[in-house]
């Protein structure tokens, strides 16, 4: 038990007064997700909760005990991807913590994690019409079933719109709606101390996946870029992301992310040239061959989001038939 205590101390760190970052493992990936614990006497509030794996749930419970919290009072989820929402049903609902989620995330939960068959078929059709070979489309559409195994759902107590104030521990945080990575993605902003809890919206090293797919909004890239500019305009003193370490300079990071996506738009326009292409062709040309099918799916989603942004800007045209979607220079 002493060794377990040492391990939790290594994974748990106070990143601001009364704010503790807990780094949790992500099953299936060689990575970590940061969740944030806000202790308040014998209770605590949580921002995100990791996947519903034994290792993650045990780590959260040990962190709560280490901080003297006997129960979770509020669980706020930045978005319903499994590494952020997975353990929601373990810590919230049915007399446990109150669960807060943006209202645009709520209708995505049931088809993604509970009754999967319709979404699996919808994703398969989406992959096929965008040029994915049938064998790959079958594998990729069925991969959703594996993710559902690390998610325990819960009904929200509060559906958020943005601009609400939520007390987390001793802090009062404002909800910032930042769609793009997910339709109802939110950040939490501590106006008093200039702390931005950024979820997956602004990461210090990685560019979050901005994808066009059956559960996305119609134009996720433009929404994402607008949200980046809004968060930079808040001028936070410290950004606390869901992946990677806290960092102080949001302005230069946002500039880098915006420039990255603008370069990618130009690259895709060059790839299309004068030849009509599928989203799958564009993704393979842009990112090259990859053995990992899941990475290929993310590449397709990201490529399609950029193609859609180019279409909105009037720089490409989109041709849709019952069996295919093709893109060409406008």
Please place each PLM-identified region on the residue numbering.
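Conserved beta-strand hairpin/beta-sheet module of binuclear metal-dependent hydrolase folds
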Residues: 9-67, 71, 97, 188-199, ...
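C-terminal regulatory/interaction regions
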Residues: 1-3, 266-330
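Short, contiguous alpha-helical
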Residues: 93, 178, 311
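Short aromatic-enriched loop/helix-cap "lid" or pocket-rim segments at secondary-structure transitions
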Residues: 32-34, 111-114, 209-210, 252-253
């Amino acid at each position: 038990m002493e060794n377990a205590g040492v391990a939790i101390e290594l994974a748990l760190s106070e990143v601001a007064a009364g704010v503790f970052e807990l780094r949790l493992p992500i099953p299936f990936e060689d990575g970590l997700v940061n969740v944030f614990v806000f202790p308040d006497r014998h209770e605590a509030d949580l921002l995100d909760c990791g996947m519903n794996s034994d290792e993650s749930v045990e780590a959260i419970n040990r962190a709560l005990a280490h901080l003297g919290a006997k129960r979770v009072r509020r669980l706020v989820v930045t978005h319903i991807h499994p590494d952020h929402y997975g353990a929601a049903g373990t810590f919230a609902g049915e007399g446990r913590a109150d669960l807060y989620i943006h209202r645009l995330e709520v209708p995505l939960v049931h088809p993604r994690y509970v009754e999967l068959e319709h979404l699996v078929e919808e994703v398969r059709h989406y992959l096929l019409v965008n040029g994915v070979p049938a064998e790959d489309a079958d594998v990729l559409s069925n991969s959703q079933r594996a993710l559902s195994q690390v998610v325990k759902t819960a009904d929200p107590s509060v559906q958020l719109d943005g601009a609400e104030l939520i007390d987390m521990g001793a802090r009062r945080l404002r909800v910032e709606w930042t769609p793009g990575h997910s339709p109802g993605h939110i950040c939490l902003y501590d106006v008093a101390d200039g702390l931005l809890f950024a979820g997956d919206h602004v990461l210090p090293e990685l560019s979050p996946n901005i994808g066009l797919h059956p559960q996305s909004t119609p134009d996720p890239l433009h929404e994402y870029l607008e949200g980046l500019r809004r968060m930079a305009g808040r001028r936070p003193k410290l950004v606390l992301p869901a992946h990677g370490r806290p960092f102080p300079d949001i302005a230069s990071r946002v500039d880098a992310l915006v420039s990255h996506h603008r370069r990618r738009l130009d690259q895709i326009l060059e790839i299309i040239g004068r030849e009509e292409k599928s989203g799958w062709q564009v993704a393979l040309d842009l990112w090259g061959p990859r053995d990992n099918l899941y990475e290929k799916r993310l590449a397709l989603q990201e490529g399609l989001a950029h193609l859609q942004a180019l279409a909105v800007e009037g720089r490409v045209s989109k041709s849709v038939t019952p069996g295919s979607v093709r893109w060409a220079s406008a």
